[in-house]
Amino acid sequence: MSEEARETPGVHNPHVIDLISLDPEANEVVLLMLEERPWGTVPNQLDQLDDKYNSYISYVLDGHLAKQPPQYADKAVRIQLDCASPPGSREQVRINAMRNFAVSERLRFRMSVIVAQDPS
């Protein structure tokens, strides 16, 4: 895999944490997964989502997040999936399973549909 491919954010790349930020209102560390492709446009899209999600779960549960800057210490963790289109029924089943697993590990999970801004 090329260096550029490893560094490209998005659900298609499980080797990258797309974004880590603080949500001061919720007092949470947010690990963002970004899916810019419409659901169902790539045959292995759900497998890619699984791989990305599992990487994020491992990053948190294996203690890698805890080694980050101190402002993340003692904060709740939310994994957030921002996607370009609403999920279909197949995708929603998978997202619900991810949410349920996250909750079982005392993590939060949120899915949001992001709407592209009209440049005009």
Question: Model-predicted segments: where are they?
Answer:
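N-terminal targeting leaders that direct proteins to extracytoplasmic destinations
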Residues: 1-3
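N-terminal intrinsically disordered, cationic/polar leader segments
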Residues: 5-21, 96-100, 104, 111-113
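Short glycine/proline-enriched loop/turn "hinge" motifs that connect secondary-structure elements
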Residues: 20-26, 68-73
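Exposed, flexible binding/inhibitory loops of compact, secreted disulfide-stabilized domains
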Residues: 25, 40, 116-117
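Short glycine-rich, basic-tinged beta-strand/loop micro-motifs
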Residues: 29-37, 72-85
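Acidic, aromatic-enriched beta-alpha/helix-loop junctions
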Residues: 43-67
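Secreted/extracellular ectodomain signature
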Residues: 44, 71-75, 90-94
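Helix-rich interaction surfaces within compact, conserved domain-sized segments
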Residues: 78-120
